[in-house]
Swiss-Prot record:
Polar residues compositional bias, start-end: 456-467
Protein name: WEB family protein At5g55860
Family classification: Belongs to the WEB family.
One GO term describing the cellular component: plastid
GO terms for biological process, alphabetical: cellular response to mechanical stimulus
Region (Disordered): 443-483, 583-611
Comp. bias (Low complexity): 468-482
Keyword DNA-binding (UniProt): no
Keyword Coiled coil: yes
Positions in coiled-coil regions: 59-227, 267-356, 391-461, 505-549
Keywords, ordered alphabetically: Coiled coil
Organism: Arabidopsis thaliana (Mouse-ear cress)
Biased composition (Basic and acidic residues): 443-453
Length: 649
């Protein structure tokens, strides 16, 4: 046994016990005194004499005191565990906030990487478009002058006009395609509406037939009900007649029995009793038959009424369905009207589009004739394209390499996103663990409150017991068995080990999250370095594209000069022809004019031909950019067309 002893001052008559501590100062000095004090004897108003001491009550008090002591120990341990859990929670919350911040930073960096990747892709696409638009011409050009800038501006305006015309054509084609699609959709809707209307009309006819059949069945059921009621009334009348006859027979038999009793012949009485029993049996059988007939009649009436109610419900449902079908037919008619209106509008738009398409076909035929003339001239310029093709191939290979690098960056960004998601999942797991720890802390708090309440109740009980006893001084001993002491110590060790295990698990999770975040940061740094390399590569590609644009502009300036020379030559030739014609007309005499007048027609025809040639050359000037773009299908890369008389440089 384990004993704890202490002493109390003689001046303290009533002990003051603090909550959470055990008062070791006892009012007795020996075990016998304790047994005498804490026995069954208690002071009462009726019997001031002490009762015989009970040793069980003293043992109960000792057990309660030991339980109080152990509860206080457990309370202290729980408080320590609570403090540890709160510290762990605060650490985990701070680590959670830090990890959330890191995740947000990582997401921002990923977004920046994606934006830079998109910008790099856009830059590469722009470079490709510039390369595709670039025309061949590997020529050393002199310093730009005012004339060249004007020529380039005029060429740009012509190209813009051509592009606007192409855009208008594309818009018209798109509109025509959309109108055709709407027309087909409208026609399909009309056909579907017709089919639906046919189906609904067939359904309406079927429903009408069903309604007529139901009405006939309802009338038949009504007739059957009336007949059944008549038969029921007849059966009831017959049963009443039979009952009256049975009652009359019973009365007659009763009278006969009374008369026979008066006569009192024993043998005859026995016979009458036998007859009475037989009549009673027959009456019982008849009553049973009556009851069965009534039950069958009631069942038949109930069945007929149920069938009537079901027929009425079906009739009401059919009426409602007929109304809904009529509403559907009306709505379908309205939709048909709307579809017809839309169909008429679509036909009007189609007529307008067909007229516009006819005009466009005429323009296309003219442009095709001009294209055929230009194709014959463009065959001369293929030799000058080879050098430019080499440079363009190099630039395209570089752009493809940049694209591949961009795709690699995309894949890396996707991997980083996956890693970020895994980090998010790890954070969520840690949050779950934290929540579990918080729940455990709350449970510990609840246990603490329960233990405090128990301690308060036990302390109140002990105070009451102490106040009831006398103020004798003595020694107090708290006894515990070895098994209880060992079990309590084992519990304390188990609780300590569990707390340490939980703390270690939380720390391991936090370290794993930190390691994953460090890995993601390293990968982000590597991706940023690769993005910088990509930016440098794209800048080089843009520089090369700018060089190609400069070469293109130089080629276009020289083409413009050659065209202006040809135009000047054509205008000079036209003016010479006109001057010669006027001189011939002035030199001829008046009598010869009558005979030579019909010969002036070919001169006028020549003048008209020269004018048309000049006009055709002027018309060919704005159409050159369109010709260059259209010729890309025949030649691998675009080439500038040359007018007759021009030489490839």
């Amino acid at each position: 046994m384990v004993a704890k002893k202490g002493r109390r001052d003689s001046s303290d008559s009533s002990p003051i016990v603090e909550v959470g501590e055990i008062d070791t100062s006892a009012p007795f000095q020996s075990v016998k005194d304790a047994v005498n004090l804490f026995g069954e004897a208690a002071f009462s108003a009726e019997k001031p004499v002490f009762r015989k001491p009970n040793p069980q009550s003293a043992e109960k008090v000792l057990v309660k005191q030991t339980e109080l002591h152990l509860a206080q120990k457990e309370l202290n341990k729980l408080k320590e565990q609570l403090k540890n859990a709160e510290t762990i929670r605060e650490q985990a919350l701070s680590e959670l906030e830090w990890s959330k911040r890191t995740v947000d930073e990582l997401t921002r960096k990923l977004e920046a990487v994606n934006e830079s990747r998109d910008s790099a892709n856009k830059a590469t696409e722009a470079a490709k478009s510039l390369i595709e638009e670039a025309k061949p011409g590997n020529v050393s050009v002199a310093s730009s002058s005012d004339a060249q800038t004007r020529d380039m501006e005029e060429y740009g305006e012509v190209c813009k006009e051509l592009d606007t015309a192409k855009q208008e054509l594309r818009k018209i084609r798109q509109v025509s395609n959309e109108i055709l699609e709407t027309k087909t959709v409208a026609l399909s809707k009309v056909e579907e509406a017709k089919k639906v209307s046919k189906v609904h009309s067939e359904k309406i006819e079927l429903l009408r037939k069903e309604i007529a059949a139901v009405n006939e069945s309802v009338e038949q059921t009504k007739l059957a009900c009336s007949q059944a009621r008549k038969e029921q009334s007849e059966i009831f009348a017959e049963k009443e007649i039979q009952q009256k006859s049975y009652k009359a027979g019973m009365e007659e038999s009763a009278k006969k029995s009374l008369a026979l009793k008066n006569e009192f012949d024993p043998e005859f009485a026995k016979k009458l009793e036998v007859q009475l029993t037989e009549t009673y049996n027959e009456i019982d059988e008849l009553q049973k038959q009556m009851e069965t007939a009534k039950a069958s009649d009631i069942d038949s009436v109930n069945g007929v009424s149920l069938e009537l109610n079901e027929a009425k419900g079906l009739f009401e449902k059919l009426v409602e369905e007929e109304k809904s079908l009529q509403e559907l037919v009306e709505s379908l008619k309205a939709e048909l009207k709307n579809v017809k209106m839309e169909h008429d509008e679509v036909e009007a738009k189609e007529a307008e589009i067909e007229s516009v398409a006819g005009d466009l076909h005429l323009k296309l035929s003219r442009s095709k004739s001009e294209l055929e003339q230009c194709v014959t001239e463009e065959s001369k310029a293929k030799a000058a394209l080879e050098d430019m093709m080499l440079t363009i191939n190099q630039i395209s290979s570089e752009t493809e390499a940049a694209r591949r690098e961009a795709e690699g960056m995309r894949n890396k960004a996707k991997e980083l996103m996956k890693e970020a998601e895994s980090a998010h999942l790890a954070l969520e797991d840690s949050e779950l663990h934290l929540r579990v720890a918080l729940d455990e802390a709350e449970e510990a708090k609840a246990a603490e409150t329960k233990a405090l309440e128990q301690i308060k109740s036990m302390s109140e009980k002990t105070n009451a017991a102490r106040n009831s006893t006398s103020s004798e001084s003595g020694s107090q001993s708290i006894t515990l068995s070895q098994e209880e002491f060992k079990s309590l110590s084992k519990r304390a060790e188990v609780f300590d080990k569990l707390a340490e295990m939980k703390v270690a698990a939380a720390l391991a999770q936090v370290e794993a999250v930190r390691a994953s975040e460090n890995e993601t940061l390293k990968k982000l740094e590597t991706t940023q370095e690769e993005i910088k390399k990509l930016k440098t590569a794209t800048e080089e590609a843009l520089k090369k594209a700018a060089m190609a644009d400069a070469a293109k502009k130089a080629v276009e300036g020289e083409l413009r000069r050659w065209r202006e020379r040809d135009q000047k030559k054509a205008e000079e030739a036209a003016t010479r022809i006109l001057a010669e014609a006027e001189m011939k007309m002035a030199s001829e005499s008046s009598p010869q004019q009558h005979y030579k007048a019909p010969k002036q027609k070919p001169v006028n025809n020549k003048l008209e031909k020269t004018k048309t040639s000049v006009v055709s050359k002027k018309v060919l000037m704005p159409n050159l950019s369109g010709i260059f773009n259209r010729k890309k299908n025949q030649v691998e890369w675009g080439s500038p067309s040359y007018l007759p008389g021009e030489k490839p440089f």
